[in-house]
From Swiss-Prot:
The active site is at D56 (nucleophile). It catalyses: uridine(38/39/40) in tRNA = pseudouridine(38/39/40) in tRNA. Gene3D superfamilies: Pseudouridine synthase I, catalytic domain, C-terminal subdomain (3.30.70.660). Its EC number is 5.4.99.12. One of its GO terms (molecular function) is RNA binding. The keyword tRNA processing applies. Substrate binds at Y110. It comes from the Archaea. This is tRNA pseudouridine synthase A. The keyword Isomerase applies. Keywords: Isomerase, tRNA processing. Formation of pseudouridine at positions 38, 39 and 40 in the anticodon stem and loop of transfer RNAs. Belongs to the tRNA pseudouridine synthase TruA family.
Length: 251
């Protein structure tokens, strides 16, 4: 019989996908899931997690989610995870008295970063994928239904890069990378031609930004984000240095 103290916990977290060997626990001891499970198991919290979304190798996340059943306080668990795992940050949680299937979300938001300002042609090509379509030709074949709905596509434009935001309840394997790859290489109607995954965009610019649930509000966990700030500052300086290199070459 389960303890009365046993609670159901959703944890929202992010990770730098380039630092891990894929996501799924079966792929490697250094996969995202494996690293989390190893720490939770070491501290006798749990030996299993249920993930809301699986990302491709080298794809990062800012708001993925996993579920565990536990008797420990959420703050203690997030403190353990943040203190023992590099290149991940565990920032929010939701506690419930009953089971929550983490995959039953209402919306996922992905961001794809393009390192330049895109023109209207590329925007139009990407916008063609809005709505409900059969994405068989824009995904890696697996057992899942290839019909998916993209509810919204937004473009965030900055001085020297563009962020494409995709909103949808669920996506199939390689779908968004295939969309970006096709849109960059072809002006044809993507659903009127025979095409299969010929142009797969790079995984590193893709980020699972957030997963949203109906009637669930995550509680923010206060943690020391000095590592993230320091990493950002060092990478920002490095990017400026290489920008100077490029300008000196172009002169």
């Amino acid at each position: 019989m389960a303890s009365q103290r046993e609670m159901h916990l959703l944890i929202k977290y992010g990770y730098d996908g380039t630092k891990f060997e894929g996501f799924d626990r079966s792929n490697s001891k250094n996969s995202v899931e494996s690293v989390i499970i190893n720490v939770l198991s070491e501290y006798n919290i749990t030996k299993n997690i249920e993930s809301a979304a699986r990302t491709d190798k080298n794809v990062s996340a800012a708001g993925n989610v996993f579920y565990i059943k536990t008797e420990e306080r959420p703050e203690k668990i997030l403190g353990i995870l943040n203190g023992n795992i590099k290149n991940m940050f565990f920032h929010s949680y939701y506690l419930s008295n009953s089971y929550i299937n983490p995959r039953y979300n209402s919306m996922k938001i992905y961001k794809y970063i393009i390192p330049y300002r895109i023109d209207s042609r590329l925007k139009n090509n990407i916008a063609r994928f809005l709505g409900t379509h059969d994405f068989t030709n824009f995904s890696k074949n697996d057992y899942r239904n290839p019909v998916r709905t993209i509810n919204k596509i937004e473009f965030e434009e900055y001085n020297d890069f563009t962020v494409v935001n995709f909103y949808g309840k669920s996506f199939v394997w390689h779908q968004l990378r295939s969309i970006i790859g096709f849109a960059m290489h072809s002006d044809e109607d993507p659903f009127s031609i025979k095409y299969h995954n010929r142009f797969l965009a790079e995984p590193e610019p893709l980020i699972l930004y957030d997963i949203i649930y109906d009637n669930i509000s995550f509680i923010k966990y206060r943690f020391n984000n000095r590592y993230i700030k320091n990493k950002y500052n060092s990478l920002f300086i490095e990017s400026i240095i290489y920008r100077v290199f490029l300008r000196s070459i172009d002169v």
